[in-house]
From Swiss-Prot:
Gene field: thrS
Taxonomy of the source species: Archaea, Thermoproteota, Thermoprotei, Thermoproteales, Thermoproteaceae
Cofactor(s) required for function per UniProt: Zn(2+)
Region (Editing domain): 1-143
Organism in which the protein naturally occurs: Pyrobaculum aerophilum (strain ATCC 51768 / DSM 7523 / JCM 9630 / CIP 104966 / NBRC 100827 / IM2)
Subcellular location: Cytoplasm
Free-text note on domains in this protein's UniProt record: The N-terminal domain is an archaea-specific tRNA-editing domain that hydrolyzes incorrectly charged L-seryl-tRNA(Thr). Catalysis of tRNA editing is performed by the charged tRNA itself.
Protein name: Threonine--tRNA ligase
């Protein structure tokens, strides 16, 4: 933040034309014997109370030294070339005004933000009448650290005992220990190159070098995996046993909309801004679209609870050096489910089932979660038994972070972490109980007494983002390899489920007939018709992690059977209909997608 102090005998201003979509009411004003604070809010400035107290303290100190009887906060964009976004600047100026007003024993005024203004000023011309300052948010950092220390952590066991994380016995809880070291004691995460990164290339998960940092591209194998997870997220959402409405919408929203602006402020500087005729933000989750739609629905208490799901392309401006393939991205896909409930009691009841499904789904990968429950102090005091019940359902201790104050739109924010092959906690799934956004966006329902009420909203990503779910899948493969096992993707998620390899050209027709049958059953199958040796074809299929390799020669054709090499499961001969049944059994309850590649390997470019 840059400021110019002018001690003025008199100062007046009058708004003329709007300069921004985001603006205050156009009020005129004047002051005598005033310290005029021309203020430019810069990128990186935040509406943090400790930072603003530091700025206000300097303003008031100067006002006292020059014996000013009034202070005027005047938005002035011409002191810096690195300005904050309008919504941030406006919030910072408004909060600075409130802090100065609460501490200065005199008149405090503020000129409106977002206008071209005419002003007249008469500077008093003494040695302290013209001063400049530059402030950085770091100046309030020590106070912020002290405020953060008012947050506290406890470990709650399934029988309701409460423990200090520093004194807890972690002998049987290695994953919890890893989470506590990261979250409570801020220890550095384990180093080293994660093994899963080696796997991604073969499936076509890559950075896009011609885009912004943190943006990926997805080859055909990666694309089918992504879309299968997207499809599966809807199946999982419906398994909650409530009505679920799947929607689609835009990824850009106007910052001039009050609800959008106030919600965006909660997210801070990680926003993607698009400069057009008006300032737009790229959504960081599906909240904006779903809430904008729900506010137009006529909802009765009889409809609740219900869910809205969108596979939202989401944008978060992560630091370039922090982006990681599949895990921390600037653009990703979020199967974002919002569940609308009558009140907090019903929301808590719904989350019991939600909690069960979240653990069920990670369990299907052979993994489990270690949980961090972020709660407001009021929720913790009033609903501690609810947290104990969730710990009981998990069958192990949970970490709880208690946050004082009411500065959050949620009362509960749960993070579900796996511990990766390097021993690092990695958040995958989540849910929140939101008590603020229904009112912010004007989402209402009519209760049984014909009264208008605001629903309590559960935000959840049951599987996590699409990419993070796949990250968990590939990290599981890394753990398998570390344990000396053969990594094997779930059959439903394998880009190619069966590869048919004819021993010779004479067997190609039979191979095609086998592929036709499998394809008709919704199985993703391809044929290696290249002019390569049989051993190389088998080796390439194994390197590609194909779950089932079918080798057919003249003998198999004569006998009407197929020779199968199952990944991690040996070799055997069976009839084709038996293989179809086996694949159907393995993929029951999961979505189907066709092959996104030419069926014949000879038709693929060398990248494949």
């Amino acid at each position: 933040m840059r400021v110019l102090y002018i001690h003025a005998e008199r100062f007046n201003w009058e708004p003329r034309d709007p300069a921004l979509d985001i603006r205050d009411e156009p009020t005129s004003g004047n002051a005598n014997n005033a310290l005029v604070v021309f203020t430019s809010v810069e990128r990186g400035d935040v509406p943090d109370e400790n930072f603003l107290r530091a700025v206000a303290s300097d303003i008031i100190d100067v006002a006292k030294k020059v014996k000013a009887s009034a202070i005027v906060i005047y938005p002035y964009a011409h002191l810096s070339s690195d300005l904050a976004r309008p919504y941030t600047a406006r919030e910072v100026l408004n909060k600075l005004f409130e802090v100065v007003k609460s501490q200065f024993n005199g008149e405090v005024l503020k000129a409106p933000f977002g206008y071209y203004k005419a002003f007249e000023i008469k500077c008093l011309g003494h040695p302290l009448s013209e001063l400049s300052r530059s402030f950085k948010p770091e100046e309030g950092r020590a106070d912020r650290r002290a405020e953060e220390r008012r947050d506290y952590y406890v470990i709650i066991t399934p029988n309701g005992e409460e423990h200090d994380p520093a004194k807890f016995n972690y002998a049987n809880y290695g994953d919890l220990k890893a989470l506590v070291e990261k979250e409570v004691f801020r220890k550095e995460l384990g180093g080293g190159e994660p093994k899963y990164l080696e796997y991604l290339r073969k499936f076509g998960f890559e950075w896009e070098p011609m885009s912004d940092a943190g943006h990926m591209r997805y080859a055909p194998e990666a694309t089918v995996m992504m879309e299968l997870v997207e499809d599966y997220s809807y199946i999982v959402a419906k398994s909650l046993g409530i009505p679920v409405f799947k929607i689609r919408g835009t990824n850009m929203f106007k910052l001039s909309e009050k609800a959008i602006e106030s919600h965006a402020r909660l997210f801070g500087e990680r926003l993607y801004i698009v400069e057009s005729d008006t300032d737009l933000i790229l959504r960081y989750a599906a909240c904006f679209q779903q809430f904008a739609m729900a506010k137009d629905w006529v909802i009765s208490y009889k409809h609740l609870p219900f869910g809205m799901l969108e596979i939202a392309d989401s944008y978060r401006h992560e630091q370039p050096g922090e982006t990681v393939l599949l895990f921390r991205l600037r653009r990703f896909y979020m199967p974002d489910l919002h569940i609308f409930t009558k009140d907090l009691k019903e929301a808590m009841e719904v989350t019991y089932k939600l909690h069960e499904v979240i653990f069920r789904e990670i369990g299907k990968l052979g993994r489990t979660y270690v949980s961090l429950y972020n709660v407001t102090e009021g929720f913790y005091k009033n609903h501690r038994d609810y947290l104990v019940e969730l710990a009981r359902r998990e069958g192990k201790p949970i970490l709880v972070r208690v946050l004082p104050g009411q500065k959050y739109y949620w009362v509960l924010n749960v993070e579900f972490h796996i511990v990766d092959e390097l021993g690092r906690p990695r958040e995958i799934a989540t849910f929140q109980i939101d008590v603020g956004n229904a009112q912010r966006f004007g989402i209402k329902y009519v209760d049984e007494n014909n009264q208008i009420k605001y629903p309590v909203i559960i935000h959840t990503a049951i599987l996590g983002s699409v990419e993070r779910y796949l990250y968990a899948v590939f990290d599981t493969m890394a753990k398998m390899e570390k344990e000396g096992k053969v990594p094997r993707l779930p059959t439903w998620l394998s880009p190619v489920q069966v590869r048919v390899i004819p021993v010779s050209k004479e067997n190609l027709k039979y191979a095609i007939s086998i592929a036709d049958v499998l394809e008709a059953e919704g199985i993703r199958v391809d044929i290696d018709d290249r002019e390569e040796t049989l051993s190389k074809k088998i080796r390439d299929a194994e390197t590609s992690w194909i779950p089932y390799i079918v080798v057919v020669g003249s003998k198999e054709e004569a006998e009407g059977v197929i020779a199968v090499r199952e990944r991690g499961g040996g070799q055997y001969k069976i009839r084709l209909e038996e293989l179809v049944k086996k694949l159907k059994d393995e993929t029951r309850g999961y979505p189907q997608r066709p092959l996104y590649l030419p069926r014949l390997l000879s038709q693929r470019p060398s990248r494949f």
